Regions:
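Acidic pyrophosphate-coordinating catalytic loop
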Residues: 233-237, 261, 306-318
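NUDIX/MutT-family hydrolases
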Residues: 321-364
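Conserved hydrophobic/aromatic beta-strand scaffold that supports enzyme active sites
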Residues: 209, 255, 317-321, 337-339
Protein backbone atom coordinates (compact mmCIF):
# COMPACT_ATOMS: atom_id res chain seq x y z
CA UNK A 1 0.00 0.00 0.00
CA UNK A 2 3.03 2.28 -0.25
CA UNK A 3 2.58 3.00 -3.95
CA UNK A 4 1.73 6.74 -4.27
CA UNK A 5 -0.84 6.29 -7.05
CA UNK A 6 -3.18 4.10 -4.99
CA UNK A 7 -6.50 5.79 -4.22
CA UNK A 8 -6.69 7.13 -0.68
CA UNK A 9 -9.33 5.29 1.37
CA UNK A 10 -10.72 8.57 2.67
CA UNK A 11 -11.27 9.92 -0.84
CA UNK A 12 -13.02 6.75 -1.98
CA UNK A 13 -15.18 6.70 1.14
CA UNK A 14 -16.18 10.34 0.81
CA UNK A 15 -17.28 9.96 -2.81
CA UNK A 16 -19.18 6.75 -2.09
CA UNK A 17 -21.01 8.19 0.90
CA UNK A 18 -22.17 11.25 -1.02
CA UNK A 19 -23.46 9.06 -3.83
CA UNK A 20 -25.23 6.36 -1.83
CA UNK A 21 -26.95 8.82 0.48
CA UNK A 22 -28.43 10.59 -2.53
CA UNK A 23 -29.20 7.69 -4.85
CA UNK A 24 -29.66 4.45 -2.92
CA UNK A 25 -32.62 2.25 -3.82
CA UNK A 26 -35.70 2.12 -1.63
CA UNK A 27 -35.73 -1.52 -0.54
CA UNK A 28 -38.00 -2.97 2.17
CA UNK A 29 -35.16 -4.07 4.48
CA UNK A 30 -33.68 -0.58 4.40
CA UNK A 31 -36.83 0.87 5.93
CA UNK A 32 -36.18 -0.95 9.20
CA UNK A 33 -32.54 -1.07 10.24
CA UNK A 34 -33.08 -3.57 13.03
CA UNK A 35 -30.65 -6.53 13.21
CA UNK A 36 -33.32 -9.11 12.38
CA UNK A 37 -34.35 -7.47 9.09
CA UNK A 38 -30.71 -6.93 8.12
CA UNK A 39 -29.85 -10.54 8.90
CA UNK A 40 -32.77 -12.01 6.94
CA UNK A 41 -32.16 -9.79 3.91
CA UNK A 42 -28.42 -10.46 3.80
CA UNK A 43 -28.92 -14.21 3.93
CA UNK A 44 -31.58 -14.06 1.22
CA UNK A 45 -29.35 -11.89 -0.98
CA UNK A 46 -26.52 -14.42 -0.98
CA UNK A 47 -26.27 -15.60 -4.61
CA UNK A 48 -29.77 -14.22 -5.33
CA UNK A 49 -30.83 -11.08 -7.23
CA UNK A 50 -32.49 -8.20 -5.36
CA UNK A 51 -35.58 -8.28 -7.58
CA UNK A 52 -36.07 -11.95 -6.73
CA UNK A 53 -35.54 -11.40 -3.00
CA UNK A 54 -38.00 -8.52 -2.44
CA UNK A 55 -41.28 -10.52 -2.53
CA UNK A 56 -39.72 -13.37 -0.53
CA UNK A 57 -38.48 -10.95 2.12
CA UNK A 58 -41.91 -9.36 2.42
CA UNK A 59 -43.63 -12.74 2.68
CA UNK A 60 -41.08 -13.94 5.25
CA UNK A 61 -41.45 -10.86 7.44
CA UNK A 62 -45.23 -11.14 7.33
CA UNK A 63 -45.04 -14.74 8.53
CA UNK A 64 -41.99 -14.43 10.84
CA UNK A 65 -41.86 -10.78 11.98
CA UNK A 66 -39.28 -11.43 14.71
CA UNK A 67 -36.79 -13.92 16.11
CA UNK A 68 -39.31 -15.52 18.45
CA UNK A 69 -41.85 -16.31 15.74
CA UNK A 70 -39.14 -17.83 13.55
CA UNK A 71 -37.72 -19.92 16.39
CA UNK A 72 -41.18 -21.27 17.26
CA UNK A 73 -42.02 -22.26 13.67
CA UNK A 74 -41.83 -25.80 12.32
CA UNK A 75 -39.18 -26.74 9.78
CA UNK A 76 -41.93 -27.43 7.25
CA UNK A 77 -43.34 -23.94 7.70
CA UNK A 78 -39.92 -22.30 7.31
CA UNK A 79 -39.15 -24.27 4.15
CA UNK A 80 -42.62 -23.59 2.73
CA UNK A 81 -42.14 -19.81 3.03
CA UNK A 82 -38.63 -20.12 1.57
CA UNK A 83 -39.62 -22.51 -1.24
CA UNK A 84 -38.50 -21.25 -4.64
CA UNK A 85 -35.64 -19.08 -3.37
CA UNK A 86 -33.11 -21.90 -3.60
CA UNK A 87 -30.05 -22.80 -1.51
CA UNK A 88 -32.30 -24.26 1.17
CA UNK A 89 -29.50 -24.70 3.70
CA UNK A 90 -29.88 -20.95 4.22
CA UNK A 91 -33.43 -21.40 5.48
CA UNK A 92 -32.46 -24.28 7.74
CA UNK A 93 -29.58 -22.24 9.18
CA UNK A 94 -31.87 -19.25 9.78
CA UNK A 95 -34.25 -21.48 11.70
CA UNK A 96 -31.50 -23.08 13.80
CA UNK A 97 -29.90 -19.72 14.45
CA UNK A 98 -33.19 -18.22 15.63
CA UNK A 99 -33.61 -21.09 18.07
CA UNK A 100 -30.06 -20.63 19.35
CA UNK A 101 -30.54 -16.87 19.73
CA UNK A 102 -33.66 -17.48 21.80
CA UNK A 103 -31.92 -20.13 23.91
CA UNK A 104 -28.55 -18.41 24.35
CA UNK A 105 -29.24 -14.69 23.92
CA UNK A 106 -32.83 -14.25 25.08
CA UNK A 107 -34.12 -13.65 21.56
CA UNK A 108 -31.80 -10.70 20.87
CA UNK A 109 -29.24 -10.82 18.05
CA UNK A 110 -25.85 -10.21 19.68
CA UNK A 111 -23.91 -7.08 18.80
CA UNK A 112 -20.51 -8.67 19.46
CA UNK A 113 -18.59 -10.10 16.51
CA UNK A 114 -17.38 -13.20 18.35
CA UNK A 115 -20.90 -14.11 19.47
CA UNK A 116 -22.29 -13.61 15.98
CA UNK A 117 -19.65 -15.79 14.35
CA UNK A 118 -20.46 -18.59 16.79
CA UNK A 119 -23.99 -18.88 15.38
CA UNK A 120 -24.80 -21.37 12.57
CA UNK A 121 -24.59 -19.98 9.06
CA UNK A 122 -22.94 -16.72 10.12
CA UNK A 123 -19.63 -16.02 8.39
CA UNK A 124 -17.42 -12.97 8.29
CA UNK A 125 -19.46 -11.24 5.59
CA UNK A 126 -22.86 -11.66 7.24
CA UNK A 127 -21.44 -10.68 10.63
CA UNK A 128 -19.92 -7.55 9.11
CA UNK A 129 -23.20 -6.63 7.42
CA UNK A 130 -25.20 -7.00 10.64
CA UNK A 131 -22.66 -5.16 12.77
CA UNK A 132 -22.27 -2.25 10.35
CA UNK A 133 -25.78 -1.88 8.94
CA UNK A 134 -27.74 -2.56 12.13
CA UNK A 135 -25.34 -1.58 14.90
CA UNK A 136 -23.23 1.07 13.15
CA UNK A 137 -19.95 -0.65 13.93
CA UNK A 138 -16.88 -0.23 11.74
CA UNK A 139 -16.79 -3.75 10.36
CA UNK A 140 -16.00 -4.47 6.69
CA UNK A 141 -18.03 -6.54 4.23
CA UNK A 142 -16.77 -8.47 1.23
CA UNK A 143 -19.28 -10.08 -1.11
CA UNK A 144 -19.12 -10.54 -4.87
CA UNK A 145 -20.11 -6.94 -5.58
CA UNK A 146 -17.60 -5.44 -3.15
CA UNK A 147 -14.87 -7.77 -4.40
CA UNK A 148 -15.44 -6.58 -7.97
CA UNK A 149 -15.43 -2.89 -6.98
CA UNK A 150 -12.19 -3.21 -5.01
CA UNK A 151 -10.44 -5.20 -7.74
CA UNK A 152 -11.21 -2.36 -10.16
CA UNK A 153 -10.54 0.59 -7.88
CA UNK A 154 -7.14 -0.83 -6.94
CA UNK A 155 -6.51 -2.60 -10.29
CA UNK A 156 -5.89 -5.99 -8.70
CA UNK A 157 -4.81 -8.42 -11.42
CA UNK A 158 -4.65 -11.53 -9.25
CA UNK A 159 -7.28 -14.25 -8.84
CA UNK A 160 -9.81 -12.70 -6.42
CA UNK A 161 -10.66 -16.12 -5.01
CA UNK A 162 -7.06 -16.88 -4.03
CA UNK A 163 -6.21 -16.82 -0.33
CA UNK A 164 -3.63 -14.03 -0.60
CA UNK A 165 -5.91 -11.81 -2.70
CA UNK A 166 -8.82 -12.53 -0.35
CA UNK A 167 -6.74 -11.27 2.58
CA UNK A 168 -5.75 -8.19 0.57
CA UNK A 169 -9.36 -7.40 -0.28
CA UNK A 170 -10.46 -7.74 3.35
CA UNK A 171 -7.66 -5.36 4.33
CA UNK A 172 -8.77 -2.82 1.73
CA UNK A 173 -12.41 -3.12 2.80
CA UNK A 174 -11.33 -2.60 6.41
CA UNK A 175 -9.32 0.52 5.54
CA UNK A 176 -12.28 1.96 3.67
CA UNK A 177 -14.77 1.44 6.47
CA UNK A 178 -12.29 2.75 9.05
CA UNK A 179 -11.75 5.89 6.97
CA UNK A 180 -15.46 6.75 7.00
CA UNK A 181 -16.98 8.90 9.77
CA UNK A 182 -17.78 6.91 12.89
CA UNK A 183 -21.52 6.91 12.23
CA UNK A 184 -21.23 6.08 8.52
CA UNK A 185 -19.94 2.50 8.48
CA UNK A 186 -23.29 1.09 7.37
CA UNK A 187 -23.72 3.66 4.62
CA UNK A 188 -20.18 3.05 3.37
CA UNK A 189 -20.67 -0.70 3.15
CA UNK A 190 -24.06 -0.23 1.55
CA UNK A 191 -22.46 2.10 -0.98
CA UNK A 192 -19.87 -0.51 -1.95
CA UNK A 193 -22.53 -3.18 -2.40
CA UNK A 194 -24.89 -0.83 -4.24
CA UNK A 195 -22.17 0.36 -6.59
CA UNK A 196 -21.26 -3.20 -7.52
CA UNK A 197 -24.89 -4.13 -8.07
CA UNK A 198 -25.93 -1.14 -10.18
CA UNK A 199 -22.90 0.46 -11.86
CA UNK A 200 -19.68 -1.49 -11.35
CA UNK A 201 -21.29 -4.59 -12.82
CA UNK A 202 -19.65 -7.65 -14.41
CA UNK A 203 -18.54 -7.25 -18.00
CA UNK A 204 -18.83 -3.62 -19.07
CA UNK A 205 -19.25 -1.30 -16.05
CA UNK A 206 -21.01 2.05 -16.47
CA UNK A 207 -17.98 4.18 -15.67
CA UNK A 208 -19.67 7.36 -16.90
CA UNK A 209 -22.16 7.08 -14.04
CA UNK A 210 -19.67 5.90 -11.42
CA UNK A 211 -19.06 8.28 -8.49
CA UNK A 212 -15.52 6.98 -7.96
CA UNK A 213 -14.39 6.64 -11.60
CA UNK A 214 -11.90 9.49 -11.15
CA UNK A 215 -10.01 7.56 -8.45
CA UNK A 216 -10.35 4.10 -10.04
CA UNK A 217 -7.02 2.65 -11.20
CA UNK A 218 -8.52 0.05 -13.53
CA UNK A 219 -10.52 2.80 -15.25
CA UNK A 220 -7.41 4.97 -15.54
CA UNK A 221 -5.52 2.06 -17.09
CA UNK A 222 -8.41 1.14 -19.40
CA UNK A 223 -8.74 -2.38 -18.01
CA UNK A 224 -11.95 -2.10 -15.97
CA UNK A 225 -13.70 -4.73 -18.11
CA UNK A 226 -10.83 -7.13 -17.39
CA UNK A 227 -11.08 -6.83 -13.60
CA UNK A 228 -11.49 -8.94 -11.65
CA UNK A 229 -9.74 -11.58 -13.70
CA UNK A 230 -11.93 -14.53 -14.56
CA UNK A 231 -11.01 -18.17 -14.20
CA UNK A 232 -11.94 -20.41 -17.15
CA UNK A 233 -15.45 -21.76 -16.71
CA UNK A 234 -16.17 -25.44 -17.04
CA UNK A 235 -19.52 -26.54 -18.34
CA UNK A 236 -21.54 -28.03 -15.46
CA UNK A 237 -22.61 -31.66 -15.89
CA UNK A 238 -26.17 -32.47 -16.90
CA UNK A 239 -28.36 -35.23 -15.47
CA UNK A 240 -31.80 -36.54 -16.34
CA UNK A 241 -34.15 -37.24 -13.45
CA UNK A 242 -37.58 -38.79 -12.99
CA UNK A 243 -40.53 -37.52 -10.96
CA UNK A 244 -43.47 -39.90 -10.65
CA UNK A 245 -46.97 -38.47 -10.25
CA UNK A 246 -48.84 -41.25 -8.46
CA UNK A 247 -52.50 -41.13 -7.39
CA UNK A 248 -54.40 -43.41 -5.04
CA UNK A 249 -58.02 -44.50 -5.43
CA UNK A 250 -59.19 -41.33 -3.68
CA UNK A 251 -57.36 -39.13 -6.19
CA UNK A 252 -54.65 -38.13 -3.72
CA UNK A 253 -51.06 -37.52 -4.80
CA UNK A 254 -48.06 -39.27 -3.26
CA UNK A 255 -45.39 -36.92 -1.90
CA UNK A 256 -42.07 -37.77 -0.30
CA UNK A 257 -40.02 -35.65 2.10
CA UNK A 258 -36.31 -35.49 1.43
CA UNK A 259 -33.83 -36.23 4.26
CA UNK A 260 -32.92 -33.16 6.33
CA UNK A 261 -29.29 -33.19 5.19
CA UNK A 262 -28.17 -32.60 1.63
CA UNK A 263 -29.52 -30.80 -1.41
CA UNK A 264 -33.17 -29.72 -0.96
CA UNK A 265 -33.10 -31.21 2.54
CA UNK A 266 -36.48 -31.29 4.28
CA UNK A 267 -38.47 -30.31 1.19
CA UNK A 268 -41.37 -32.32 -0.19
CA UNK A 269 -41.78 -33.49 -3.76
CA UNK A 270 -42.83 -36.25 -6.09
CA UNK A 271 -41.00 -39.59 -5.74
CA UNK A 272 -38.21 -40.39 -8.16
CA UNK A 273 -34.54 -39.60 -8.62
CA UNK A 274 -31.58 -39.21 -10.95
CA UNK A 275 -31.30 -41.60 -13.87
CA UNK A 276 -28.23 -43.78 -14.24
CA UNK A 277 -25.91 -43.49 -17.24
CA UNK A 278 -27.57 -45.09 -20.24
CA UNK A 279 -30.87 -45.64 -18.42
CA UNK A 280 -33.97 -44.79 -20.45
CA UNK A 281 -36.52 -42.56 -18.79
CA UNK A 282 -39.23 -45.23 -18.48
CA UNK A 283 -36.83 -47.58 -16.70
CA UNK A 284 -35.72 -44.72 -14.47
CA UNK A 285 -39.25 -44.17 -13.21
CA UNK A 286 -39.61 -47.84 -12.26
CA UNK A 287 -36.22 -48.12 -10.53
CA UNK A 288 -36.18 -44.82 -8.63
CA UNK A 289 -39.73 -45.22 -7.28
CA UNK A 290 -39.01 -48.79 -6.20
CA UNK A 291 -35.81 -47.76 -4.41
CA UNK A 292 -37.29 -44.67 -2.79
CA UNK A 293 -40.75 -45.78 -1.66
CA UNK A 294 -40.99 -49.52 -2.40
CA UNK A 295 -43.70 -49.30 -5.05
CA UNK A 296 -43.82 -51.12 -8.37
CA UNK A 297 -45.16 -48.68 -10.96
CA UNK A 298 -45.84 -48.47 -14.67
CA UNK A 299 -45.14 -45.08 -16.28
CA UNK A 300 -47.97 -43.51 -18.24
CA UNK A 301 -48.51 -40.14 -19.88
CA UNK A 302 -45.63 -37.67 -19.74
CA UNK A 303 -46.65 -34.44 -18.00
CA UNK A 304 -43.62 -32.20 -18.50
CA UNK A 305 -39.84 -32.10 -18.91
CA UNK A 306 -38.44 -29.31 -16.76
CA UNK A 307 -34.87 -28.00 -17.14
CA UNK A 308 -33.28 -26.51 -14.04
CA UNK A 309 -29.80 -25.26 -13.13
CA UNK A 310 -28.23 -25.71 -9.71
CA UNK A 311 -24.91 -24.20 -8.66
CA UNK A 312 -22.68 -26.99 -9.94
CA UNK A 313 -24.89 -29.05 -12.25
CA UNK A 314 -28.00 -28.98 -14.44
CA UNK A 315 -30.93 -31.37 -14.62
CA UNK A 316 -33.92 -32.10 -16.79
CA UNK A 317 -36.72 -33.42 -14.61
CA UNK A 318 -39.13 -35.67 -16.51
CA UNK A 319 -42.55 -35.91 -14.84
CA UNK A 320 -44.97 -38.69 -15.73
CA UNK A 321 -48.15 -40.12 -14.31
CA UNK A 322 -47.37 -43.57 -12.95
CA UNK A 323 -49.79 -46.40 -12.16
CA UNK A 324 -49.24 -48.52 -9.05
CA UNK A 325 -48.82 -52.21 -9.86
CA UNK A 326 -47.94 -53.47 -6.39
CA UNK A 327 -46.90 -52.37 -2.93
CA UNK A 328 -47.64 -49.75 -0.31
CA UNK A 329 -45.50 -46.60 -0.10
CA UNK A 330 -42.90 -46.58 2.64
CA UNK A 331 -39.96 -44.21 3.33
CA UNK A 332 -37.03 -46.34 2.17
CA UNK A 333 -34.81 -43.56 0.80
CA UNK A 334 -36.68 -40.53 2.07
CA UNK A 335 -37.72 -39.08 5.41
CA UNK A 336 -41.49 -39.52 5.03
CA UNK A 337 -44.28 -40.33 2.58
CA UNK A 338 -47.71 -38.75 2.49
CA UNK A 339 -50.89 -38.84 0.40
CA UNK A 340 -52.24 -35.33 -0.20
CA UNK A 341 -55.17 -33.88 -2.12
CA UNK A 342 -54.73 -31.64 -5.13
CA UNK A 343 -55.74 -28.64 -3.04
CA UNK A 344 -53.11 -29.46 -0.42
CA UNK A 345 -50.19 -29.63 -2.85
CA UNK A 346 -49.46 -25.91 -2.77
CA UNK A 347 -49.35 -25.94 1.04
CA UNK A 348 -46.13 -27.97 1.04
CA UNK A 349 -42.56 -26.72 0.71
CA UNK A 350 -41.79 -27.83 -2.84
CA UNK A 351 -38.63 -27.18 -4.88
CA UNK A 352 -39.06 -25.04 -7.98
CA UNK A 353 -39.09 -28.10 -10.25
CA UNK A 354 -41.85 -29.87 -8.32
CA UNK A 355 -43.87 -26.67 -8.08
CA UNK A 356 -43.73 -26.50 -11.88
CA UNK A 357 -45.07 -30.04 -12.05
CA UNK A 358 -48.02 -28.95 -9.90
CA UNK A 359 -48.60 -26.03 -12.27
CA UNK A 360 -48.52 -28.41 -15.24
CA UNK A 361 -51.03 -30.68 -13.51
CA UNK A 362 -53.35 -27.74 -12.93
CA UNK A 363 -53.10 -26.70 -16.58
CA UNK A 364 -53.83 -30.16 -17.90
CA UNK A 365 -56.66 -31.02 -15.46
CA UNK A 366 -55.33 -34.43 -14.37
CA UNK A 367 -57.76 -37.25 -13.55
CA UNK A 368 -58.98 -37.56 -9.99
CA UNK A 369 -58.74 -41.37 -10.11
CA UNK A 370 -55.76 -43.60 -10.92
CA UNK A 371 -55.29 -44.87 -14.43
CA UNK A 372 -57.13 -48.02 -15.44
CA UNK A 373 -55.73 -51.06 -13.65
CA UNK A 374 -54.65 -49.16 -10.52
CA UNK A 375 -55.19 -50.36 -6.96
CA UNK A 376 -58.72 -50.78 -5.68
CA UNK A 377 -58.02 -50.93 -1.98
Amino acid sequence: MSRPNLPLPGAVASLLLAWVRADRRDLPWRRRRDPYAVWISEVMLQQTQVTTVVPYFQRWMARFPDISSLAAATSDDVLRIWAGLGYYARARNLHRMAQEIVARHGGTIPSEKKALLALPGIGRYTAGAILSLAFGQREPVLDGNVRRVLCRVYDIADDPTGAATERQLWQLATKLVMSAPEDAAGDLNEGLMELGALICTPGEPDCAACPIADVCLAHAHGVEAERPIKRPRTRPPHYDAAAAVILDEAGRYLLIQRPAAGLLGGLWGFPGGVLQDGEVVAEGFVRTVREQVGLEVAPGDMIASIPHAYTHFRITLHASRCRIIAGEPQPLRCAAVRWVTAGELTGYALPVTDAKIVQALQRHAPPTLPLEGGPTG
